């Protein structure tokens, strides 16, 4: 394996900084959004929804409200040119409403440890695109609502 380029090293540092901004009580959505380019976006693949501008931070706030102790455990973080790939898990205790496209899941008190893969593309040290692939069926099963999602939802 060849050595990382200075751009790849910088890109990895940018992504580690991005994750640090959304950890538990230290959550700083405004600074999280500021790391994106003006034309950048966040793509929540499971919901098939792209967010632009200030809305990039919406899912950060949704998950922070539902899981106030939210922590992202990074297993693998690798850069390839202007791309950074991250394998991680989203971890936390479900203590608040979880708003999803189908409705709202009230707090269950259960622990989530959902597998996730994030794919970033950077331009000049800022995030242009962030595609987030969360294993939603596993997340819903961990909350105890997967097999009976309709009964668990508030509309």
Q: What do the PLM-derived regions correspond to, one by one?
A:
Residues 115-135:
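A contiguous, mid-protein "functional segment" used to position or interact
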Residues 128-155:
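Low-complexity, intrinsically disordered terminal/linker segments enriched in charged
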Residues 5-6, 105, 140-145:
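A short acidic/glycine-rich loop-to-helix N-cap element
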Residues 96-108:
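Short, surface-exposed loop/helix-turn segments at secondary-structure junctions
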Residues 11, 29-96:
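A solvent-exposed, acidic/Ser-Thr-rich amphipathic alpha-helical stretch
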Residues 1-38, 151-155:
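Short, low-complexity N-terminal intrinsically disordered segments enriched in polar/charged residues
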Residues 71-72, 112-117:
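Short, surface-exposed coil-to-beta transition loops
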């Amino acid at each position: 394996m060849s050595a990382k380029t200075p751009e790849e090293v910088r890109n990895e540092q940018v992504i580690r900084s991005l994750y640090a901004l959304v950890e538990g009580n230290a959550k700083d959505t405004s600074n999280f959004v500021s790391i994106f380019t003006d034309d950048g976006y966040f793509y929540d693949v499971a919901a098939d929804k792209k967010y632009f501008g200030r809305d990039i931070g919406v899912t950060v706030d949704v998950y922070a409200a539902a899981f106030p102790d939210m922590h992202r455990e990074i297993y693998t973080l690798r850069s390839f040119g202007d791309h950074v790939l991250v394998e991680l898990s989203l971890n936390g205790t479900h203590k608040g409403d979880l708003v999803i496209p189908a409705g709202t899941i009230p707090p269950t008190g259960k622990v989530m440890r959902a597998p996730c893969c994030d794919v970033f593309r950077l331009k000049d040290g800022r995030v242009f695109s962030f595609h987030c692939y969360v294993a939603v069926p596993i997340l819903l099963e961990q909350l105890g609502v997967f097999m009976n999602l309709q009964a668990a939802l508030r509309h």
